[in-house]
Swiss-Prot record:
GO terms for biological process: protoporphyrinogen IX biosynthetic process from glutamate. The record marks 83 as: Important for activity. Possesses an unusual extended V-shaped dimeric structure with each monomer consisting of three distinct domains arranged along a curved 'spinal' alpha-helix. The N-terminal catalytic domain specifically recognizes the glutamate moiety of the substrate. The second domain is the NADPH-binding domain, and the third C-terminal domain is responsible for dimerization. This is Glutamyl-tRNA reductase. It comes from Methanobrevibacter smithii (strain ATCC 35061 / DSM 861 / OCM 144 / PS). It is an enzyme of class 1 (oxidoreductase). Pathway: Porphyrin-containing compound metabolism; protoporphyrin-IX biosynthesis; 5-aminolevulinate from L-glutamyl-tRNA(Glu): step 1/2.
Amino acid sequence: MILNLRVDHKIANIDAMENIAKEMDQLFLELQEKYSIVEYVEISTCNRKEYYIHNDNIDASDSLLSHENKSIIIDYGDSVIKHLFRMTSGLESMIVGEDQILGQVSDAKQKAFKERHCGKILDSIFTKAIHVGRVVRNKTNINKGSISIGSAAVDLAEKHLGNLENKSVLVIGAGKMGKLVAKALAEKNLNAIFVANRTYYVAVELANDLNGHAVLFNELGKYVQTADLIISATGAPHYILNKERLEKTDGDFKDLLMIDIANPRDICEDVCELGVKLFNIDDLREIADENTKLRKKEFAEAENIIDEEFSLLKESFKLIGVEDIIANLRVSMENIRERETEKAIAKLSDVDANAKIIDNLTNSIVNKIFFDISKKIKQAAHENDEELIRAIEFMFEEK
């Protein structure tokens, strides 16, 4: 069974998502313990949290999967795969067509593979999903002129501050999302751009790319009080900025705009008590909706590609199901060949002269027979002929 647990921007705001994600983590742990789940991929981004699970023992009627929190979507089978294909194609993103999700899914798969909990089935599904995302982007205009969460945050800042020219901006976080923010800011002719990251050399690298200035994390307060705009996008599990931290500085924050695009959030809402204008991922929805309208006509073509690739994947699953049978068949036939070859050689008077000839002959015969049988097995798999597959498997079982 393929099982998907998820929460995303479509069904929950950022505040709810943080809490639901914790519930979902707990639900996954309970399922993992009960069903000994070893094959799974976890995806966590700024506006979604998902688990993809492959386990043939899970009971769909289990009370654990009748979860009380309706904001956790629990999905099974083919619809899970199609959802993943839509996601890698950018159709499920808040910013439709954005390219970052493709890298995020690829990273999640690689992490699962490295940690040895991405088996043959999930590896096939995710490899195909990444391929689908690339094909959709190559064959449609879904990502033409595409914006990202980072550039959408900069657009939001311009709506509230006007032109960013000669403004002083602090970017907190120099990871992938922080780099997207910085890339969008680089075109704005700023007065100054400062980059803060917990690992200082990473901040230095990004700041150098922008002709900006790197900031030590423990000196953040000094730069907060001089900034016109702060955009935060770290992977921290806790708040980076809150009212208490701001009060320790001498700044006047009544004209300060903060945009928090992290999940979990980096900036506590209590900073608003000091006059800060604070926005988060939920506030990007208006920009996201405008972007979706521009790309709506690309949806149908993308969906057609998804359907075609899904059909190809389903066909490949049929072959995966008989791979072990074919491998065992090959071993069984080779064992027979070796035994019979040894018997024949033992009866020869001039062993050295004839052994190699007999070995090559029997090997050639087995290869030809094996090719024909394996071809029939694959054909039976494509035609869903389970009876023939089981018959062949039974014939070559170890007795």
